Amino acid sequence: MSKQTRPHRNFYGRLKGKSLKAAQKRYLDEDLAALSPGAVGWEENPDRRPLDLPGLFEGKPVWLEIGFGGGEHLVHQAAQNPDIGIIGAEPYINGVAMLLGKIRRAGVENLAVHAGDARDLMDVLPAASIDRAFLLYPDPWPKARHHRRRFVTAEHLDPLARALKPGSVFRVATDIEDYVRQTLQEVPKHGFKWLANAPQDWRRPWPDWISTRYEQKALREGRTPHYLTFVRE
């Protein structure tokens, strides 16, 4: 494969917040490199060679969480599903550091972590290689002029659809009603079908759900979580 031209990608949002604790810096120094899913960045993989997911996870089915926040859900799923390999993508380094601490405490070994833009990761995921994907409480970008920054746009949904296997599940959780509107409007345009027949299908959490700190904040502030399930057609 010849070297590809790197696309221009705007990145919006924070990469780093308040100062990291000494332990968090140590986790990043000692653990992050070993949890890499492989060559994702353009500098190390300009040809955009696909990742070797069977080699990474010993042939296990692979799940993907896009924007894992503090990592509660990611570690929970890894602990509950040891026969699944899970990749988490998160550009916010404070969230990555929080996740690494949780991984140490939980002792899970079926995780890989991309500390960067999910678009770069999706570039190098093999076609039809992912069995399940999660988008949980993504940045809502509430201003109308910023809605194009949301994940549920063609720029993100097309590469996600390419990476997901037919019949695989895509879960979206959000407490923002307009994000629900845009999700239901845009996701079905890109090869997905919404699995809902009645209101309880999106009001009720999934059976294996763990409530995250983002969800708890939404509940305290009086917002209603929505749990949307799609299948890749």
Curated annotation (Swiss-Prot):
GO terms for cellular component: tRNA methyltransferase complex. Substrate binds at K143, D175, T212, R213, Y214, E215. Coiled coil: none annotated. The active site is at D139. Pathway: tRNA modification; N(7)-methylguanine-tRNA biosynthesis. Its EC number is 2.1.1.33. It holds the Pfam family Methyltransf_4. NCBIfam families: tRNA (guanosine(46)-N7)-methyltransferase TrmB (TIGR00091). This is tRNA (guanine-N(7)-)-methyltransferase. It comes from Roseobacter denitrificans (strain ATCC 33942 / OCh 114).
